[in-house]
Amino acid sequence: MSSDSREGPSRFKFRESTRTPLEVPATVLIAGGEIQAKTANVSLGGVFISLPKPPPVGTMVKFALDLNEKAVRGFSEVVWIRPAQESLDRPVGMGLQFRHFLDDGEGALRLFLAEQLQNLEGT
């Protein structure tokens, strides 16, 4: 775990929870428009979503992550972006910090990530 931080209005502490490199389908609702995307990594605290034109830091985003048979839904905030001019060999997109899960989304995400980490350690 790292104590890196990114500057921004919320002074979000980057990488507070273990990130799992994981590409899963994601749907984000930004300014009334639904966008289909993919994650690059997921943690209990947030997610990086690859998106060609990420919205500005501070934007509230409704999200849905398709975790096999369970969709995890909720609300998040854009806490940092990686624009095209800074991407080099990394994906363009946005770092979202989870703000609120719907239903038992947090529990489902916790279980899913534990299974993914176990699979990674077993290989």
Write out the residue ranges for each language-model feature.
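N-terminal helix initiation/capping motif
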Residues: 1-44, 110-123
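Short, solvent-exposed secondary-structure boundary/capping segments
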Residues: 48-51, 83-97
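Short, surface-exposed secondary-structure edge patches
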Residues: 17, 50-54
